[in-house]
């Protein structure tokens, strides 16, 4: 048991991705008027809550992880950290994160952190992941909470922009997760996890991917239509969304579904990273509907 093991069970890669989305939501709401104290509270607080959820997930999924090639060497599977200590660690991380958001940001930001945690640990990890093909859909809501937390840490309100972020990031999660399920198909089948490709086939999953990317593309444009983000953001969102859709369409002719799914997965990360950056820098200081640009 070492410090490295305690870091590993928090899934640092997932935390880093969530930090980017928290920052995107925060800077979108800040409109250039940045309170760095609140920013740090939002980033650190959300990171702690996400870390807590990941540790709990590691605890819950020990039996599943033993059956999957990519996870069978995880810290808890190997017994490098005891279950009791991991549960205590996860609890302390969660309390610290929610407490920081509540005291240094606002109660609304803390509330969304709690909602995301409950969905991820309670609904998804403990129940739906093992029992329902719809587990991915429910789990996507938890993955969409970080940008909402960042936004609400500034705005202290759940407005159209916050709703758009929630919908947008939830929709993004679906093709992203389905791509993983395709190129890790054998792992999911061995672990008896009822993801869409395993339960209904890869062709059906490809259709769902196309529909979710199309819906995601429309949702991303709403930040500019609603007067929250600018035309540069719009151009990047439209361009990357359409290319992601094109990549998904190419999946129907793919010779190797594993190779295609990996490429789709990688581009999904580029897409959401680019949009998080663009909403951070191309915000609208005064809210103007897109129709304003036409006159």
Swiss-Prot record:
Misc. comment: Carbon 2 of the heme B porphyrin ring is defined according to the Fischer nomenclature.
Q: Which reaction does it catalyse?
A: heme b + (2E,6E)-farnesyl diphosphate + H2O = Fe(II)-heme o + diphosphate
The record's HAMAP family line, in alphabetical order, gives:
CyoE_CtaB
Location relative to the cell: Cell inner membrane
Q: What is its EC number?
A: 2.5.1.141
Function in brief: Converts heme B (protoheme IX) to heme O by substitution of the vinyl group on carbon 2 of heme B porphyrin ring with a hydroxyethyl farnesyl side group.
Pfam short name (any one)? UbiA
Write down the PANTHER family for this protein, in alphabetical order.
Answer: PROTOHEME IX FARNESYLTRANSFERASE, MITOCHONDRIAL (PTHR43448:SF2)
Where's it mainly located? membrane
Tell me the route in metabolism or biology where this protein functions.
Porphyrin-containing compound metabolism; heme O biosynthesis; heme O from protoheme: step 1/1
The protein's UniProt keywords, in alphabetical order, are: Cell inner membrane, Cell membrane, Heme biosynthesis, Membrane, Transferase, Transmembrane, Transmembrane helix
Membrane association type: Multi-pass membrane protein
Recite the lineage of the species.
Answer: Bacteria, Pseudomonadati, Pseudomonadota, Gammaproteobacteria, Pseudomonadales
In the record, biological process GO terms are: heme O biosynthetic process
Q: What is this protein called?
A: Protoheme IX farnesyltransferase
Enumerate the GO terms in the molecular function aspect.
protoheme IX farnesyltransferase activity
Which protein family is it in? Belongs to the UbiA prenyltransferase family. Protoheme IX farnesyltransferase subfamily.
Task: Output the superkingdom of the source species.
Answer: Bacteria
Query: Which parts pass through the membrane?
Result: 9-29, 36-56, 80-100, 108-128, 135-155, 163-183, 209-229, 230-250, 265-285
Question: Can the keyword Cell inner membrane be found in this entry's annotation?
Answer: yes
Give the UniProt entry's GO cellular component terms: plasma membrane
